[in-house]
Amino acid sequence: MHDRYTNPLCTRYAGRTMQHIYSDDNKFSTWRRLWVALAESEQELGLPITDAQLEQLRAHITDIDYAYAAEREHEVRHDVMAHVLTYGACCPDAKPILHLGATSCYVGDNTDIILMREALEQIRSLLVNVIQALADFAEMHKAQPTLAYTHFQAAQPTTVGKRATLWAQDLLMDLEQLEFQLEHLKLLGCKGTTGTGASFLALFDGDEQKVVALERKICKKMGFSGAYPVSGQTYSRKVDFQVLQVLSGIAQSASKFSSDIRLLSHLKEVDEPFESGQIGSSAMAYKRNPMRSERIASLSRYVICDLQNAAVTASAQWFERTLDDSANRRISIPEAFLATDGILTLYLNVIRGLTVYPKMAEKHLAEELPFLATENILMYCVKEKGGDRQALHEAIRQHSVAAGKAVKLGGGSNDLLARILADPIFGLTRDELDKLVDPHAFTGMAVHQTETFLREQVAPVLNKYTTLLGCEASVNV
């Protein structure tokens, strides 16, 4: 169907699992499971609902007549009532007790929470796999020296693996926030039109204990520890904000990673995966653009901005509820999850297939290391050669200025080390100088830090989630 808009989050970016979570089938069958849980619980607490009625409801959880539902919604202009009528049409015996005492938000809001939990679990699975891939990458390259950058200007060397631990640490923070939200998510429960439980109190002839028990039973049947203690007709929309805040955090981390990869690609120190028939540019046939990292940045920007929808919606609710949240939430919440799913799939694909070019890293180090090594040279020549610290400092300054001019004005290579080696004031041999400028001597505790981080921070997480490891990371385009 090419004469209508289709969402690229589904056609290009998000995986099948996340698309299923936010599919009509999953949404409306969850509505029906909630209706079954309500009827079962009401029967258990003494309302006149028969086993035959319950069996009829259970038998028709997934066979949803969408055409019939669309016709009913066109008539009644109310999606929940349309599906009440649709469910009732295939469960005629149970129709009289369907949705008994409930309001629309009983199925709507509770389903939103259930789907968000399912979606967070899928995001967690992807996130753990990305962390594992980063850990493998960091371990593999923990001792590979590379130039570090501050302000994107050359700084003291680090290692490729140590840099990867920075990316992984951001994701561990995101995982911690995700786990917190999963642990604290609760259902709306069944509190009626304004959150007072009045309709259920009437059903149970004023028995407050039965109203409380009803909600507990429903929560247990739906796999939740409980409901939010108080609510209006809806659960607080701050819940949506807090959940989307987790996704925004993941997007921030992924965007930072993608920016680093794009810059490293420009430096020719890494290449992201590139298919045999892939085209980088329609005009420049030689190009290998970091398009997957660019796509991560693009989708991340969307998720970060989407958080504002949840913030504004939460702030704009009136009293016990208003409907100005509805249309926005139908779009903003699923799309945040679909986009984040796409982001993490791309992240996993890139880091698993990332090619590192040590010779290019060494080349860039060689260009800058002479300047970075001057302090070590100065100290060695004072301590081991008996040199005058001030005289040596002035000699280094003069040679550094001259070498810098040669590089910047003449486009030449950095010959600072050759100048120092040729200057008798230093008295250095080639072997001595080579040892003083060994890149590994300038990476500090990078290897130790990487090993410690992987052992103490990453390994416990991967051990906890062993069953989640092994996700595929196929990219559609």
List each language-model region with its residue ranges:
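A helix-coil-helix interface module used to build multimeric assemblies
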Residues: 1-198, 206-217, 280-281, 291-295, ...
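Amphipathic alpha-helices that form helix-helix packing interfaces
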Residues: 38-41, 123, 127-130, 134-137, ...
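Glycine-rich cofactor-pocket loops
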Residues: 139-161, 271-287, 320-327, 352-372
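Short, well-ordered beta-strand elements within core beta-sheets of diverse protein domains
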Residues: 162, 241-249, 376-385
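Active-site-adjacent "gating/activation" loops or surface patches in catalytic cores
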Residues: 208-233
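A conserved active-site cap/scaffold subdomain adjacent to cofactor or substrate pockets
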Residues: 234-269, 278-339
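Active/binding-pocket-proximal capping segment
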Residues: 271, 394-402
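Long, amphipathic alpha-helical stalk/connector segments used for oligomerization, subunit docking
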Residues: 302-387, 395
